[in-house]
């Protein structure tokens, strides 16, 4: 099933947010409206209205969830996993970088990661507060703590908070529920090494507090089984130069 990134390509271009500028200030990227997107530290984030993609169409590689305001974790086949990570090998496991599809946007290659969130319908907001992507030449043998990932030969390839304490604001009510993607993260392929490396994605949700805490279900990262071709005109980076700067900066 083809993944539709947004309902209207023109609206996306008209509301595209350019956040790649001042890295010394914290960025709050608000994806709580229907056609919002933006850059943080070179990565492009876009809210997606993807519907359930069907068995085999996407590959879940980490589920994070708990009865707590803030949840965190990363993918690995090693057990035990971090306390808030789903232990099923179906949903939480090692991933080779060359399994993750790439997308070419205006001549630049990006790795594509799909995020599906779950919140109560009465309180649908959620913050993504940390996103760190690491690679290793060999698989992790222990994954019980974050230190198991960050220590040793792991290489940090992308950090949402590099140079600033940034966040992405999400809205569960904009999609049809669990199984519908909520956001796509495009991470520059130039940041990574060999495709034979193992890739590990750590994320934290709910840290903003207030209306943005975790309150239901799980958060899931996945990748699609095949290379992705965006719909014509949807992600035209050539339009960036004509856009106003719409970034909202946290003081």
Predicted segment positions?
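Short, threonine-centered small-residue motifs that mark membrane-proximal processing/anchoring sites
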Residues: 3-5, 9-10, 14, 23-28, ...
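Hydrophobic membrane-targeting alpha-helices
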Residues: 17-23, 245
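Surface-exposed extracytoplasmic segments
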Residues: 27-228
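Residues that form or immediately flank small-molecule/cofactor binding pockets and catalytic motifs
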Residues: 138, 239-242
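C-terminal membrane-anchoring or membrane-association module
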Residues: 246-251
